[in-house]
Amino acid sequence: MIIPIKKIILESLQDKIKHKVIVYGEAHFHRDEVDRIRNDIIKLKPDIIIHELPEDYKFYKIHLPSTRFYQLERGLDQNIYKYFKGDYKKQFEIREKNMLRNIDFVLSDGLVKMPPKVVAIVVGDTHLRTIDTPELGPKSPFYNRDYIIIRSKYKEIKWLFQLRR
């Protein structure tokens, strides 16, 4: 039986390499929050940045040119908003599963190329909710991982519900 080399490498490295993964919850529409997170990430100098907003790529390429940048929602079918119009619970479930799948892919790909020691992830703070809600479903699946999570001071989920009233 022939075992692919990538599988052998991944299996041998999994026990030895531990990533320090820091997830920032961002209130996207608060400029001070965006700037604070950007400054934190620049100081952190992570090996990889995984970001929900692809437009931040240009900023990080200027300030951290050797850091690898990945889009968090790569491969997401944008039609979910049409298929599940108004069903935020289903939209969030699909999006968050896709996000975690992309994170797993990036980390496993990184193991083969160059093991990342520090990974920064930026996601809307609502995706880091600590409570179940009828509108958005169960608490965030990000808490099922061994990640350091830094929430927004604005607690975007509260802000989201205020908008709807």
Name each model-derived stretch.
Residues 1-165:
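Compositional signal for N-terminal targeting/processing segments
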